[in-house]
């Protein structure tokens, strides 16, 4: 039996707000009773793994205020501005310099100081730290960088959780690479616990289920974190808009079903409002026709702290990836991806996806 039996050794790429909420969240729920239900997790004990079994053993970043520092310090450093939910003791994990590639956009480059340390050999670090699962939290638009780390995961035999909208698990070529290597992947693009995507998806489906014709809809998002600042660079946004849009329209059967590019569907980030910090405000409108073609419109606003809203979902994704690794399963984990991600290889209705994931957990 391995000396690390019973734990999940996790590496993080990108020590931003999402990583901060993840690390704090594991600390927050460390002593949770496995027989209770807590906000934001499917189960305190997910298969054989309790939240406290998630152990951070490596981290990569490019920010000079994070590289070279203990993970417990780095999660509160530089531009990180999410809500604090836990004191994190020193981890003895020093954040290492990853390769930049296309991970730094124009607005990032204007805001942070990039570390002048030499990039490390990522595959070597993953192997030496005996990492089980690599979580990619790179900024939106980091196509080349995300694929670099995905390949590192394959080369090191490490399960991959792809939290950003770069299409890897949902790309048949990449899916086959993971399958052939016997390496599991959960992706792509993390769904929040209750965010703009899931509420919009549910309300749009409700219109159809109640016989209302959905003619047009929009979802506008503003936030104050580095994610929203980065997304002001419209060229980095394409995959994000596609991911958020198909997450809503894939669940429909009417005129807007499966639409990504359509005049009557507009879903995406809109602006950066610095004083919101890590809060995100979503403004959603649905316009339809009810009985007699009479207009029926719904408008709502959602206010959330952005990063904690997805941290629990990542904890579940990490545990699903480790269970797959334990069972020798390679390639996309379809049930986990469908329930936990916006752009999985196979879209399923949320209730169906959850039921399939429960079945997967039970084995």
UniProtKB/Swiss-Prot annotation:
Cross-link (Isoglutamyl lysine isopeptide (Lys-Gln) (interchain with Q-Cter in protein Pup)): 65
Keywords attached to this entry: Inositol biosynthesis, Isomerase, Isopeptide bond, NAD, Ubl conjugation
Residues that bind NAD(+): 70, 129, 149, 192, 227, 240
InterPro entries assigned: MIPS (IPR052199), Myo-inos-1-P_Synthase (IPR002587), Myo-inos-1-P_Synthase_actino (IPR017815), Myo-inos-1-P_Synthase_GAPDH (IPR013021), NAD(P)-bd_dom_sf (IPR036291)
EC number(s) from the headed UniProt entry: 5.5.1.4
Cofactor(s) essential for the protein: NAD(+)
Highest taxon of source: Bacteria
Enzyme class: isomerase
Function as written in the Swiss-Prot or TrEMBL entry: Key enzyme in myo-inositol biosynthesis pathway that catalyzes the conversion of glucose 6-phosphate to 1D-myo-inositol 3-phosphate in a NAD-dependent manner.
Family: Belongs to the myo-inositol 1-phosphate synthase family.
The name this protein goes by in its record: Inositol-3-phosphate synthase
């Amino acid at each position: 039996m391995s000396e690390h039996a019973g734990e999940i050794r996790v590496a993080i790429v990108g020590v931003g707000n999402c990583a901060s909420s993840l690390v704090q969240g594991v600390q927050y729920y460390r002593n949770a009773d496995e027989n209770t239900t807590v906000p934001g997790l499917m189960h305190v004990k997910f298969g054989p793994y309790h939240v406290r079994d998630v152990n951070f053993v490596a981290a990569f970043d490019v920010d000079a205020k994070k590289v070279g520092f203990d993970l417990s310090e780095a999660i509160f450093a530089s531009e990180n501005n999410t809500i604090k939910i836990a004191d994190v003791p020193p981890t003895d994990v020093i954040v290492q310099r990853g390769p930049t590639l296309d991970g730094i956009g124009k607005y990032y480059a204007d805001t942070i100081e990039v570390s002048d340390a030499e990039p490390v050999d990522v595959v070597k670090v993953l192997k030496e730290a005996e990492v089980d699962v690599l979580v990619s939290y790179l900024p939106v638009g980091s196509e080349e960088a995300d694929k670099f780390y995905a390949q590192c995961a394959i080369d090191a035999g490490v399960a991959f959780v792809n939290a950003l909208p770069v299409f890897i698990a949902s790309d048949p070529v990449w899916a086959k690479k993971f399958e052939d290597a016997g390496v599991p992947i959960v992706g792509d693009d993390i769904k929040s616990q209750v965010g703009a995507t899931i509420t919009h998806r549910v309300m749009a489906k409700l219109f159809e289920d109640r016989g209302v014709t959905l003619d047009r809809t929009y979802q506008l998002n503003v936030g104050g974190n580095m994610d929203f600042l980065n997304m002001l660079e419209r060229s980095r946004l394409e995959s994000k808009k596609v991911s958020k849009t198909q997450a809503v329209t894939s669940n429909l059967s009417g005129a807007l079903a499966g639409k990504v590019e359509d005049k009557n569907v507009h879903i995406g980030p809109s602006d950066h409002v610095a004083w919101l910090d890590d809060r995100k405000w979503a403004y959603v409108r649905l316009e339809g026709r009810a009985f007699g073609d009479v207009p029926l419109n719904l408008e709502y606003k959602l206010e959330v702290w952005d990063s904690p809203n997805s941290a629990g979902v990542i904890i579940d994704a990490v545990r699903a990836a480790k269970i797959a690794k334990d069972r020798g399963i390679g390639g996309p984990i379809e049930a986990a991806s469908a329930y936990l991600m916006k752009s999985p290889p196979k879209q399923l209705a949320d209730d169906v996806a959850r039921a399939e994931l429960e079945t997967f957990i039970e084995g």
